Every structure is written in structure tokens, then in C-alpha cells.
Regions:
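Hydrophobic alpha-helical segments
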Residues: 43, 82, 96, 129, ...
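Short, intrinsically disordered, charge-balanced linker/junction segments flanking boundaries
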Residues: 188-194
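Short linear motifs at protein or domain termini
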Residues: 1-113
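Conserved amphipathic alpha-helical segments that form helical-bundle/coiled-coil interaction surfaces
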Residues: 107-186
């Protein structure tokens, strides 16, 4: 039984049982990206938990960027497994930056470290480097408002991270950029050139 594979760390809330089941199904390959979770009622009956616990687990997984839940009927209905680690990491970092537990300067320093590593690991022929070069040219051309410039800047830095071919570094870079995007926009809008 799937429950036999869960390490016991004390009492578990019922939504955590649902999360553990979904993790086990993903790990074993029975659920994959693009696949659908069983219907809420079916899952609740199968795991012997309330539908409220299933809904809570699904909301948590949505926030983590693991599933997308659609209501109603048709092709968009149901809960589909997705993979968007940047969303969850970015949200968590942004909240911790807002609490001032994670200083913006530390986020920027981490971003620079990861980006430097990614640039050093990238193949000179990586198409992402060519894309980054085009983005730099667009930024240097001028005539951009703050929002346009920042959008190009984000794409430039993400292209550098992607050039290394490391999915974790790419996700981390996206999350780090997202976590300080509001602060960057505030700082940039105060520059005399804009």
C-alpha cells in the first residue's frame, strides 16, 4: 500500500495524506505531467479522507505550481499535473522579502552568483546566448519605457540562466527575479532618465 512508503514524523493532517499520496504517485510514474488526478470524490473515497482535505491538498499543490485545477466539465475541467516550480519559489521568496527576513541585497547577490555560474557553464554556441545578445541590443536601442526595459531585462537574465542547461538553476533564477521584480521597478522608475 502507498501509505507504507510514508515516513512517520508524528501525527499527519489528512490533507498531508493526500499530498503524500500524490507525491508517491508522481514518484512511481503513475501520475505524470499532463495527467489528471482522480476526481475529488473518487480520491476522497480511495484515501478515506474528506473531500475538504482533498480540496485543501489541491489548493496547496496549485500554489506550489504542481497542479492546475479547472472546474466544470469539458477538456479544462479536473485537476491536471503541471510543472511550474518557478511560481511557487517566486511566491515564497517574494513573501519572505516582504517580511524583510530575506534582504533584497541577498537575493541580488544570489542571482549574480547563479547567473555567473550559468554563464561560465554555457556552451558558446548555446542558442540562449544568441537570444540574450539580441535582447541586449533591444535594450540598448533606447526609446523604451521602464516597463518595456524591465521586461527585456528579465528575459535577458533568464536567457543567460537557461544557457547553462540546468533546470534547477533556471527555476531558481526565475524565482529570484520574480521575488524582487517590484523592487526593481520602483528603483528604476526613480532614475532621472525615465
Amino acid at each position: 500500500m502507498w501509505l507504507d512508503h510514508i515516513k512517520y514524523h508524528g501525527p499527519m493532517r489528512t490533507h498531508q495524506l493526500v499530498l503524500s499520496w500524490i507525491e508517491a504517485e508522481l514518484s512511481e510514474g503513475r501520475l505524470t505531467v499532463g495527467g489528471r488526478l482522480p476526481a475529488e470524490r473518487t480520491l476522497a473515497e480511495q484515501l478515506k479522507v474528506s473531500r475538504t482535505s482533498v480540496r485543501e491538498a489541491i489548493r496547496i499543490l496549485e500554489a506550489m505550481g504542481v497542479v492546475r485545477a479547472g472546474v466544470g466539465s469539458g477538456p479544462e475541467a479536473g485537476t491536471v499535473v503541471i510543472s511550474d516550480p518557478t511560481a511557487a519559489l517566486g511566491s515564497a521568496l517574494r513573501l519572505h522579502v516582504a517580511t524583510q527576513h530575506l534582504p533584497v541585497a541577498d537575493i541580488v547577490e544570489t542571482r549574480v552568483l547563479l547567473e555567473s555560474w550559468a554563464a561560465s557553464k554555457a556552451s558558446p554556441q548555446a542558442p540562449e546566448l544568441e537570444a540574450a545578445g539580441r535582447l541586449l541590443e533591444e535594450m540598448a536601442a533606447g526609446g523604451l519605457d521602464v516597463d518595456e526595459f524591465l521586461a527585456l531585462d528579465v528575459r535577458f537574465h533568464l536567457a543567460l540562466a537557461d544557457a547553462a542547461g540546468n533546470a534547477v538553476v533556471s527555476a531558481m533564477m526565475g524565482s529570484l527575479r520574480e521575488s524582487i521584480q517590484r523592487y526593481a521597478a520602483q528603483l528604476t522608475s526613480n532614475l532621472p532618465d525615465w
